[in-house]
């Protein structure tokens, strides 16, 4: 029987959570599809999965469409993975951008994230293009602003954004959704602008902007973007630097970055990986960063605690998976492994 619920452009469709059942192993043989639950207003202190079914930002950025379908494909890849987790996992459904109104979809995602965080969940968002990042940050900001109202006066929050990505995504907004000439004075975001939008928001709010971008393809980022990153104080490493020889230096820099922040937001653009293991993206990487390097850096992010012993990581999202161009579901399985690893690390000592 299909289990499906609709609310405010958000759907919960549990039909993707199907897979193998090992009755002979009892509780020790459970898999994700047997453990993930539908969210409701009474759920607290777990992990909330939210989908962002959207590739409008990729289309505006002249990329290859197809990321809209990613959240459900990721769920299907997750469904059959073995359950080794300590926390309940809830499915909060998808925010769907069906009409080109990216800004509304990002706002709705932010509202759902704020609600999940207020209910003491940590959140994993399944994108969608990397325009998801602006919606994710809106949710974090809404949550922290609501906390500040209750506990004011309070200093500005120090939010550390850690982005594994081949691109800075610091581009300026365009004057039209299609990036073509327009007489409109309104500016539009896309999949290449989210961290510019976040930096502008932080500037208006008088919040510090702390951004780390690891895995950059220098040939895909202009001098203007490197200059802008320097002006904004961005911590960054190019893909050619992301190797075992440099791993201690990178871990040290990341540790110092984590230490100076009260909260963390982790975002992984799947195009940071080599095309050989992640063909299903809008912009496949020629070189990329190996999975073993990125998995070596994740524990420090997932285990980071504040002075109260609470996890600094509020939210993680995964972006730019494009099932249209995947080969034998290998990118889907890669994304599922990352979600599995993040969810496991959020509620354990890894």
Swiss-Prot record:
List of residues binding Mn(2+) 2: 165, 167, 269, 271
Pathway(s) annotated for this protein in UniProt: Amino-acid degradation; L-histidine degradation into L-glutamate; L-glutamate from N-formimidoyl-L-glutamate (hydrolase route): step 1/1
Reaction(s) the record says it catalyses: N-formimidoyl-L-glutamate + H2O = formamide + L-glutamate
InterPro entries referenced in this protein's UniProt entry, alphabetically: HutG, Ureohydrolase, Ureohydrolase_dom_sf, Ureohydrolase_Mn_BS
Key words, A-Z: Histidine metabolism, Hydrolase, Manganese, Metal-binding
Cofactor: Mn(2+)
Regions crossing the membrane: none
Signal sequence annotation: none
Record-level Gene Ontology MF annotations: agmatinase activity; formimidoylglutamase activity; manganese ion binding
E.C. designation(s): 3.5.3.8
EC supergroup of this enzyme: hydrolase
GO process terms (BP): L-histidine catabolic process to glutamate and formamide; L-histidine catabolic process to glutamate and formate; putrescine biosynthetic process from arginine, via agmatine
Residues that bind Mn(2+) 1: 130, 165, 169, 269
Record HAMAP family: Formimidoylglutam
Family assignment from sequence similarity: Belongs to the arginase family.
Biological role stated in the UniProt entry: Catalyzes the conversion of N-formimidoyl-L-glutamate to L-glutamate and formamide.
Protein name: Formimidoylglutamase
Originating gene: hutG
